[in-house]
């Protein structure tokens, strides 16, 4: 059977070979979640662009002795250390958060999600955000109608 597909210039699983199967499985999982089926999917790492755009805060003497502590390693801030600031405004040691964001795309404290390079996961993120916005508009409307 594979000779038939090779003769036509196609792989039996698609142009990307076995990767097509994995991509399609993930797409089906996302569609299932969008349709209300409760399931877990693997969360990809944060995109390289999102990581590069994180602002850096270098600790100076006046910052020391404050309440700033890296929530990943639990070490207090010291002069000369570099902290990265996530869009949610939480700060972490540069080394700690870069290692964290290579495993997942969310803040260790509040789970704010940074963008990823995975188009299927990004579609799910947009869907979740649209649903949250829809619920907020619905609640606002109901509050205005029924006080």
UniProtKB/Swiss-Prot annotation:
Its UniProt pathway annotation is: Protein modification; protein ubiquitination
- What reactions does this protein catalyze? S-ubiquitinyl-[E2 ubiquitin-conjugating enzyme]-L-cysteine + [acceptor protein]-L-lysine = [E2 ubiquitin-conjugating enzyme]-L-cysteine + N(6)-ubiquitinyl-[acceptor protein]-L-lysine
Q: Which domain of life is it from?
A: Eukaryota
Q: Which molecular function terms from Gene Ontology are attached?
A: ubiquitin protein ligase activity; ubiquitin-protein transferase activity; zinc ion binding
GO CC, any one term? cytoplasm
Q: Which GO terms describe its biological process?
A: protein autoubiquitination; protein ubiquitination
Q: Which SMART domains match?
A: RING
Q: To which protein family does this belong?
A: Belongs to the RNF181 family.
The entry's function note states: E3 ubiquitin-protein ligase which accepts ubiquitin from an E2 ubiquitin-conjugating enzyme in the form of a thioester and then directly transfers the ubiquitin to targeted substrates.
State what protein this is by name.
E3 ubiquitin-protein ligase RNF181 homolog
Q: What is the native source organism of this protein?
A: Drosophila melanogaster (Fruit fly)
């Amino acid at each position: 059977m594979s000779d038939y597909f090779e003769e036509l210039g196609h792989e039996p699983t698609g142009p990307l070979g076995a990767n097509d199967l994995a991509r399609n499985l993930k797409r089906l999982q996302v569609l299932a979640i969008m349709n209300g089926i409760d399931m877990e999917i693997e969360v990809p790492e944060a995109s390289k662009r999102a990581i590069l755009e994180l602002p850096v805060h270098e600790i100076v003497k006046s910052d020391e002795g404050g309440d700033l502590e890296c929530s990943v390693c639990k070490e207090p801030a010291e002069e000369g250390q570099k902290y990265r600031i996530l869009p949610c405004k939480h700060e972490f040691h540069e080394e700690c958060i870069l290692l964290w964001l290579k495993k997942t795309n969310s803040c260790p404290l509040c789970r704010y999600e940074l963008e990823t390079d995975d188009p299927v996961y990004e579609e799910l993120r947009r869907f979740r955000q649209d649903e949250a916005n829809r619920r907020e508009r619905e609640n606002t409307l109901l509050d205005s109608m029924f006080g």
